[in-house]
Amino acid sequence: MLIIDGKKVSLELKDELKASVDRYRETTGKVPGLTVIIVGEDPASQVYVRNKAKTCKEIGMNSSVITMPADTPEEHLLDTIASLNLDPAVHGILVQQPLPEQIDEFAVTLAIDPQKDVDGFHPENLGRLVMGHLDKCFVSCTPYGILELLGRYGIETSGKHCVVVGRSNIVGKPMANLMLQKLKRSNCTVTICHSATQDIASYTRQADILIAAIGRAKFITPDMVKEGAVVIDVGINRIDDPTTKSGTRLVGDVDYEGVSALASAMTPVPGGVGPMTIAMLLKNTLHSFERTHNL
């Protein structure tokens, strides 16, 4: 079985991004800039934001983090976003989720300039994706990263049956739309399964490419996968494991040990899709910089 190594590919991408940033610094005197806003003290969000800032520094991008208390009024957050929209040194704006309950996440998404929406969540970017205008939009980072992995590993997709398990706005819906596009790395027949789908296994067993993004540990078992399928595991779930020092370990939405005996190619957890998300966020930020400066 081929292991689709997202960590390895993300490092290759970072080297490519760094080379582009260095070139633009020399030719224009400017570099891309990413600003991340975090509201509250969610530990997982703080770790993720630190990783983004660290990666920006490694490739030479400017990055800043705006930290706000959990009781921040929505109006204050929206005013901050409005200022960043007008800042020519900021090419990407990301508001870390989850947000406190007093803040409307959709209002925040709408407030971000679509040209700086490097998370790809704004309705304008999603609409352009659905209509096939990928050169004029930002694609959500996790689906974008999966497409990059499929391309770099030479996975044949055109005409294949892709089954996406999960319909979130962050992964499931954009992933399905991306795999529908007339692109070399997609062009699939697509089926979406979700919590109300009856007999999910009857669909997943038909998949040439199975993408699991349902948020349930080891949900996809060997009896749900046909031999030779390509399996992409988006899930990150922490389960109890008394054999580890922490007492827990990370697993995906797929039973890796069982399914890997059937799959022709598969992403591990950790080290598969996860590392690609930040890399694609920075690739989107670079694209925003290039569009801004007509490069």
Swiss-Prot record:
Q: Which GO terms describe its cellular component?
A: cytosol
Q: In which pathway does it act?
A: One-carbon metabolism; tetrahydrofolate interconversion
Q: Which CDD domains match?
A: NAD_bind_m-THF_DH_Cyclohyd
One Pfam family in the UniProt entry: THF_DHG_CYH
Q: Which amino acid positions bind NADP(+), per UniProt? A: G166, R167, S168, S195, I236
- What EC number is given for this enzyme? 1.5.1.5, 3.5.4.9
Catalysed reactions listed for this entry: (6R)-5,10-methylene-5,6,7,8-tetrahydrofolate + NADP(+) = (6R)-5,10-methenyltetrahydrofolate + NADPH; (6R)-5,10-methenyltetrahydrofolate + H2O = (6R)-10-formyltetrahydrofolate + H(+)
Q: Which UniProt keywords apply?
A: Amino-acid biosynthesis, Histidine biosynthesis, Hydrolase, Methionine biosynthesis, Multifunctional enzyme, NADP, One-carbon metabolism, Oxidoreductase, Purine biosynthesis
Q: What does this protein do?
A: Catalyzes the oxidation of 5,10-methylenetetrahydrofolate to 5,10-methenyltetrahydrofolate and then the hydrolysis of 5,10-methenyltetrahydrofolate to 10-formyltetrahydrofolate.
- What is this protein identified as? Bifunctional protein FolD
Record the organism. Chlorobium phaeovibrioides (strain DSM 265 / 1930)
Q: What would be the name of the gene that encodes this protein? A: folD
